[in-house]
Amino acid sequence: LLTTPQNIRYFTGYDSQFWESPTRPWFVVVPLSGKPIAIVPEIGESEFQKTWLDEIKSWTSPRPEDEGITLLKSTLENIKKTFGQIGAEFGKEMTIRMPVRDLFKLKETVNTNLVDGSDAIWDIRMIKTEEEIKRIKFICSIASDAYNSLPSKLSIGDTEREAVNKLKIDILNRGADSVPFMPGISGVGGVSQIVCGPTNRTLNDGDILFIDTGSTFDGYFCDFDRNFAFGKASSEVEKVYEVLWQATEIGINAAIPGATTFDVFNAMNKVISEM
């Protein structure tokens, strides 16, 4: 049972800006064999019919007293089960995009067990296809190119917000679909946090500007940051930069088939710890 936009898009190809609204839940049931089944609010039915799915069920929504739960319950009860259980997005880095009240109601009334199915989703999604790799490579490439060209667009006196917007516009112009994540923070010699901002703080001589981005193309993200020095960077900043550069190079060399993320982390962390 899938309810989140990311997993529904992965298994069906369906994407919608309407997911920004929390009013309506959307459901996709992936059986052990055969095509997925969509149970969606009426407003999304026509577009779902353009996907590769054959079975699309809908209900008139908003309808707070029954937002698709009756339809979902009957679907779950009628599909063939081998082990008498249905997996759901209950595990790590997963959420259920439906009212918790409705989830409790579903668990109490459906004649099958709802269990954590996140391991199955992880096992499938961790292995990328060639088409997925192409999309990830594309969004990472254009973000990297935009980062590389940003210094020519920045100057002392700009604000954090102005600097971030210049990067965001460039990434979009290069072909990204959206830039949902781009914190920008600055400070003398470095920054104290990397999750908030930007603000209207003015960039001055000696400042370090940190910008991170999670930009997307066709549902796939890049996720990396860059630091920019304004005026003259201190010797301490230059030393830290050199260590991080070396750690990154070692991490790239450690990222080989068969290695784990733990292996890559340890290789990089060893360099940083010895700083």
What is the role of each PLM region?
Residues 1-275:
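Active-site neighborhoods and metal-handling regions in enzymes and metal-associated proteins
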